[in-house]
Amino acid sequence: MAFLKKSLFLVLFLGMVSLSICEEEKRENEDEEEQEDDEQSEEKRALWKTLLKGAGKVFGHVAKQFLGSQGQPES
């Protein structure tokens, strides 16, 4: 009977250890995926910032040209 108890405890212990290792690996994978998502979000944010900055410059230039031509009389 004692032999069966020891065997059962050993099986349960090994099962818990392997389960713990699997959960740890799963957590690490989730952390890596989250970090990749954060990096992609930062890249998208930087791209949008650059695009909006460029669009603002173009709009400013066009507005300046439009307003400049409005103030001058045609000859």
Swiss-Prot record:
Residues 30-41 have a biased composition (Acidic residues). It is found in: Secreted; Target cell membrane. The keyword Membrane applies. Expressed by the skin glands. GO terms for biological process: defense response to bacterium; defense response to fungus; innate immune response; killing of cells of another organism. Residues 1-22 form the signal peptide. Antimicrobial peptide with activity against Gram-positive and Gram-negative bacteria, and fungi. Has hemolytic activity. This is Dermaseptin-S11. It comes from Phyllomedusa sauvagei.
